[in-house]
Regions:
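Nuclear receptor C-terminal ligand-binding domain
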Residues: 1-218
Length: 218
């Protein structure tokens, strides 16, 4: 089995010099979300941390789409990773682990597709803010102390989004449904591959989670 991996790589946005600042700013904004919105006030502090650590990638992707972020990935050295002499079930599991941690050309194409679809919808700033809150409030997480509070907050955000669509886009009753259809793709993009692509050169030997911990304490 042969898998095309990018290995060590860096992101380029045409040499405009603003890429790192944007990525850092979006991560900082994501951390500040937990204190910004009153609807989140009923959620346990530890649960808010858990939610942020699991969803920061989704929040940044939505910032990318909102700001028409374009990028190219330039691998330092393309690598063909081969797993010979492994039985097929083990080989599939090994490849799956590789693909979730190491960026591949498939990952890059997948992310560009997701961002492109969101951009095509011409989502406004209010919608993006509410979508980020929905992504933050992941009701499927199992290690929450008070999942009911998260569910209630998520339902409130969903209602606010529905009301907003009714008032601002009355002629497009399917707009909300179309937006929500794109969220599983945002959620499903591998977080380790995303961190490797966009943040490894910024955080160095630490992790994005560690950076978020520091941001929450400041």
């Amino acid at each position: 089995m042969l898998v095309r991996m990018l290995g060590e790589c860096h992101v380029s946005t045409g040499g405009n010099g603003r890429t790192d600042n944007l990525l850092a700013e979006w991560l900082t904004r994501s951390a500040r979300m937990v204190r910004k919105y009153p609807v989140l006030g009923s959620i346990d502090t530890e649960d808010m941390r858990t939610l942020l650590y699991s969803s920061w990638k989704e929040l940044v992707i939505l910032y990318m789409a909102q700001n028409n972020f374009s990028f190219e990935v330039h691998p330092a050295a393309n690598q063909n990773i081969v797993c010979p002499h492994i039985d097929k079930p083990r080989k599939r599991r090994t490849i799956a682990r590789m693909e979730s941690h190491v960026p591949s050309t498939t990952h890059v194409d997948q992310l560009k597709f997701i961002i492109g679809k969101l951009e095509q919808m011409n989502i406004d700033s209010k919608e993006f803010a509410l979508l980020r809150l929905l992504m933050l409030l992941n009701t499927d997480l199992r290690d929450l102390k008070n999942s009911n509070a998260v569910v209630k907050a998520s339902e409130q955000i969903h209602m606010l989004l529905m009301e907003y669509e009714t008032v601002c886009y009355p002629s497009n009753p399917l707009r909300l449904s179309h937006m929500l259809l794109h969220l599983p793709g945002v959620r499903g993009f591998p977080i380790m591959a995303f961190e490797q692509l966009f943040y490894r050169h910024l955080v160095g030997n630490t992790t994005v989670k560690s950076v978020l911990k520091e941001l929450l304490e400041t």
